[in-house]
């Protein structure tokens, strides 16, 4: 475990992990595990999975309580602007998480330490680890320092959520089921591209490509809106 990380978390956020193995896991990339199999390490992908869900509900609850008069669509748009690659990667860098992630030599050489999708995953993994170690109150306390002040300052109000815009456009005259289908994952692990179609029934409305599924879905929704409004 990096003593500097432990010290910085304590000094900046008042966080002290009970189970340092969880913190260690959160900052261990799969490329590092693959290059050090003899150590029997675990990468942060499972914690990322958990942290993604924890962040979704934490931000959702905050917005629901803070804006009691807002309609669902407006809440969804703001949440999508917060719970996304651009924002999470920014939070990761502000917290200096990029300094402590353990990477394999190949990923380090390819500039992964500055890659937005990796930093997003790292932020989610950290919150997943914090949730397991101390519960959701600890996550809320951390997010109250890192994210909530930015919401109150209006930093996310100008970001566009194309998925919600597409949903509202298509559902003007009633409920319509919209489906996003992953077509392919192409490229090496350090430069993976996801291809997604957005459909209503069997009709493909648009296709998109992105560095993760969320970004690809947004790109597909944007393309669908452009074609529907043409």
Swiss-Prot record:
InterPro entries for the chain: dsRBD_dom (IPR014720), RNase_III (IPR011907), RNase_III_dom (IPR000999), RNase_III_sf (IPR036389)
Keyword Membrane: no
Enzyme class label: hydrolase
GO CC entries: cytoplasm
Sequence intervals crossing the membrane: none
Subcellular location: Cytoplasm
GO molecular function: double-stranded RNA binding; metal ion binding; ribonuclease III activity; rRNA binding
Record domain DRBM: where: 161-230
Domain RNase III: 6-135
One Pfam family linked to the record: dsrm
GO BP terms in the entry: mRNA processing; regulation of gene expression; rRNA processing; tRNA processing
Entry keywords, A to Z: Cytoplasm, Endonuclease, Hydrolase, Magnesium, Metal-binding, mRNA processing, Nuclease, RNA-binding, rRNA processing, rRNA-binding, tRNA processing
Active site: 52, 124
Residue numbers binding Mg(2+): 48, 121, 124
Main location group: cytoplasm
Subunit structure of this chain's protein: Homodimer.
Task performed by this protein: Digests double-stranded RNA. Involved in the processing of primary rRNA transcript to yield the immediate precursors to the large and small rRNAs (23S and 16S). Processes some mRNAs, and tRNAs when they are encoded in the rRNA operon. Processes pre-crRNA and tracrRNA of type II CRISPR loci if present in the organism.
Protein name: Ribonuclease 3
Species in which this protein is naturally found: Latilactobacillus sakei subsp. sakei (strain 23K) (Lactobacillus sakei subsp. sakei)
